[in-house]
From Swiss-Prot:
This is Small ribosomal subunit protein uS12. It comes from Wolbachia pipientis subsp. Culex pipiens (strain wPip). GO terms for biological process: translation. HAMAP family: Ribosomal_uS12_B. InterPro entries: NA-bd_OB-fold, Ribosomal_uS12, Ribosomal_uS12_bac. Belongs to the universal ribosomal protein uS12 family. GO terms for molecular function: rRNA binding; structural constituent of ribosome; tRNA binding.
Length: 124
């Protein structure tokens, strides 16, 4: 137990919060990486599906697992992608999303609504 004098001189150190997206660093909203593996995985109970995910190697950090949103994709090994933060609630360990329509990942085909989220240009 510290004395009053020790508390006046030093004070108490605040708690440091754990980062939710450590791979993005302090001030990067997105980062570029290279896909090392593209595969499907199953979600936690009570959901049932085959979710598309990719292992992405980020220089200066390591490998992370990122979710591929939307229907269909053209990703394969060695594709260069842009990742952003944002977890997938029913996939344990998936804390990042891959941005559609940026770098090697195409936008979703035949998408009419919410196009900006899926990297689709306005047609016509």
């Amino acid at each position: 137990m510290p004395t009053i004098n020790q508390l006046i001189c030093k004070g108490r150190s605040g708690l440091t919060r754990k980062k939710k997206v450590p791979a993005l660093g302090k001030c990067n909203p997105q980062r570029r990486g290279v896909c090392t593996k593209v595969y499907t995985t199953t979600p936690r109970k009570p959901n049932s599906a085959l979710r598309k995910v990719a292992r992405v190697k980020i220089s200066g950090y390591g490998e992370v697992t990122a979710y591929i949103p939307g229907e269909g994709h053209n990703l394969q090994e060695h594709s260069v992608v842009l990742i952003r933060g944002g977890r997938v609630k029913d996939l344990p360990g998936v804390r990042y999303h891959i941005i559609r329509g940026a770098l090697d990942l195409r936008g979703v085909q035949n998408r009419k609504k919410a196009r900006s989220k899926y990297g689709v240009k306005k047609s016509g």
